[in-house]
Curated annotation (Swiss-Prot):
Disulfide bonds: none
Species name: Feresa attenuata (Pygmy killer whale)
Protein name, entry field: Cytochrome b
Family: Belongs to the cytochrome b family.
A Pfam family recorded for this sequence: Cytochrom_B_C
Highest taxon of source: Eukaryota
Membrane topology category: Multi-pass membrane protein
Amino acid sequence: MTNIRKTHPLMKIINNAFIDLPTPSNISSWWNFGSLLGLCLIMQILTGLFLAMHYTPDTSTAFSSVAHICRDVNYGWFIRYLHANGASMFFICLYAHIGRGLYYGSYMFQETWNIGVLLLLAVMATAFVGYVLPWGQMSFWGATVITNLLSAIPYIGTTLVEWIWGGFSVDKATLTRFFAFHFILPFIITALVAVHLLFLHETGSNNPTGIPSNMDMIPFHPYYTTKDILGALLLILTLLTLTLFTPDLLGDPDNYTPANPLSTPAHIKPEWYFLFAYAILRSIPNKLGGVLALLLSILILIFIPMLQTSKQRSMMFRPFSQLLFWTLIADLLTLTWIGGQPVEHPYIIMGQLASILYFLLILVLMPTVSLIENKLLKW
């Protein structure tokens, strides 16, 4: 009799995706982040669900309901900080996952890559609307500043902003709809994840060499399930350390002050994972130009497969491309740092130079260096 795992309609799907899936034998720990992202998503949905049981999406009670969760609900403080720091872990894994894709040429699986970019945008949207919910000063002013960017759109901008707000300023209607968005988006993300995996399993995984590995595959279980469990334990250890020792390390102290439309915080800034994009936005003196640069800083990922000029898929054997890749990472870290600094000399010019370098590296330098490396292959 055939194993039920291979015949039962539901078990068959799980089997083909996580058990008997043929996997390259040489994928490194950089391939762990996919499963870690799945773990983060499950964790965020569960902690978020328990928070939603006690949270009230109303301007008069939102802030105090979060305080109530932290003070009066059993382990409410723990659930709240797991959720807040879980978002940070989510983005760390997300950026590592994208970085892996860029380095090893995984973007050549175009459908998988494009769904991935869509997932990134959905996660960013979820994190943004979620940050508004505690209704602290940075929640309110972050929502005001970022939604206001849409007013830069010619002709329909102002109407669009007021439509999103549900009034003439960020108020009760805005908070209610942001809570609705924050609740529904993770489930949309889950559906997109299924499509992401569907497309990935059509082609199979890439590997560090970038060379097809069809002749050397091993089953996903037990080899990579074990490896994923190790990654998961390290992720949980990091998250618990962050949550139990320094829960507010990555947060903003301003968010412990209730939202006040009459008092603007000295420095309005988003959470750390958006700072690189915020720095790019601020480095352009024109409002519409800044918004376009902000959008392009993320959407540029869609064009990466079209900018592939190298004859080799992976950067494993391309030292010059590796140098540019790590320059890009350093540039993004610089932008992240500058995004958290006040708008004054020397940060303004540094931000502008870092922003120019970001686009220059992706659009010009990397494709050019790839062509030079192609020439060097003939030597």
